[in-house]
Amino acid sequence: MAKFDAHLKCSFCGKSQDQVRKLIAGPGVYICDECIDLCNEILDEELLDNQTNTNNSQQVKKKLPNDNPKKCVPLELTSIPKPLEIKSFLDNQVVGQESAKKILSVAVYNHYKRLAWKVKEESKNSNSTDSQATKLQKSNILLIGPTGSGKTLLAQTLAEFLDVPFAVADATTLTEAGYVGEDVENILLRLLQKSEMNVELAQKGIIYIDEIDKIARKSENPSITRDVSGEGVQQALLKMLEGTIANVPPQGGRKHPYHDCIQIDTSQILFICGGAFIGLEDIVQKRMGKHSIGFTTNSDQNKVDTKKIIDPRDSLKNLELDDLVKYGLIPEFIGRIPVCAVLDRLTKETLESILTQPRDALVKQFKTLLSMDNVELKFEPDSVEAIANEAFKRKTGARALRSIIEELMLDVMYTLPSEENIKEFTITKKMVDNLFSSKIVKLPSGSKRIIKESA
């Protein structure tokens, strides 16, 4: 028995009982005094970190009192911008998408009217037990449109006009709690950071969740395997979209039982979800074209009507709830984003207007860049049209415009800062057609000169 005891070892460090001062036995395990000391040190360090985080959060609260100087949406009903005012501002920043801008203007106006109504009723009933007032529910927004059509820009412009915190989240990085990836609460942390950790201000903000179509479940029928980045994320987002008190870890990452969390009421936050929903047109066309495809169609008039119905450009205007369910969104999720706006695919004419009309148009941006080098940049009308035509061919929406102009202006911006004698440069249609490059000619003396080409 004594020989057997001599071979007892610590289950954690592997040292025998002869190498340590004390070996404590448990049900099938042993731990030495050195490992116990190490555990105590780890616990003391974690306790110290928790106290430090608590002190830091208290300091943040002292620095950010309720009377934060940063402005937010006034909750007086008469001060909330009217839908016509909101759309007018959107018109100055976003070209086209008239229907989507109208839907967004009304939805945003109603959302902040709802917040004003809530504040009014709370103040009215603070000294009364009567709570018979009508409760207004929140209506989140779903934007459906091809890539580069302006979904993110619309949401960002709304937040700029209303002067509220705005955060963008990518749905593709989200996973269900307990799996590798981001928890849905990290979306709220981004909004908090934009609000300088002011909870009251963040609760009046706007969150745009991009690529929402990427969390559609992989098949229409529920799967026996767990879909942690698809349907699982939709389930996790339900309460947040509807309105709940969410616990947000101030440092990000996973929630920890020993770490303090910031509580945010999401019932006042406006969620705008956007996605391209590639393939949704096919689902709509299949549903609408069933009755008039096949041998049962006898009249020529029916054939003409069928072509009109299944036109891909117009099919999403006839979108129904069942189409989104077939695409992979669960009904509970769709029910929490009742306002749906479909964005049009950008035409050549719209792309041409995007280049020149908005306040931050690309042509204006590059003119400003070259003006810093004392060079006046000009675009011939034909060159703007040629750039828009090339962007339309690439089928990536307005995003293609910047890449084309960057490629077109590369040699120009590389050489012009060193050419003090050039005060003006003109982009022509011929430059765009000739693989987007301007000619740089070497003179016999070794100096370089940019030759302007005429159309």
UniProtKB/Swiss-Prot annotation:
GO cellular component: HslUV protease complex
Gene3D superfamilies assigned: 1.10.8.60, ClpX chaperone, C4-type zinc finger domain (6.20.220.10), P-loop containing nucleotide triphosphate hydrolases (3.40.50.300)
Binding site for ATP: 146-153
GO molecular function: ATP binding; ATP hydrolysis activity; ATP-dependent protein folding chaperone; protein dimerization activity; unfolded protein binding; zinc ion binding
Pfam families per the UniProt record, alphabetical: AAA_2, ClpB_D2-small, zf-C4_ClpX
InterPro entries, A to Z: AAA+_ATPase, ATP-dep_Clp_protease_ClpX, ATPase_AAA_core, Clp_ATPase_C, Clp_protease_ATP-bd_su_ClpX, ClpX_bact, P-loop_NTPase, Znf_CppX_C4
GO annotation terms (biological process): cell division; proteolysis involved in protein catabolic process
Family the entry assigns: Belongs to the ClpX chaperone family.
Description of how the protein assembles with itself and partners: Component of the ClpX-ClpP complex. Forms a hexameric ring that, in the presence of ATP, binds to fourteen ClpP subunits assembled into a disk-like structure with a central cavity, resembling the structure of eukaryotic proteasomes.
Role, per record: ATP-dependent specificity component of the Clp protease. It directs the protease to specific substrates. Can perform chaperone functions in the absence of ClpP.
Protein name in UniProt: ATP-dependent Clp protease ATP-binding subunit ClpX
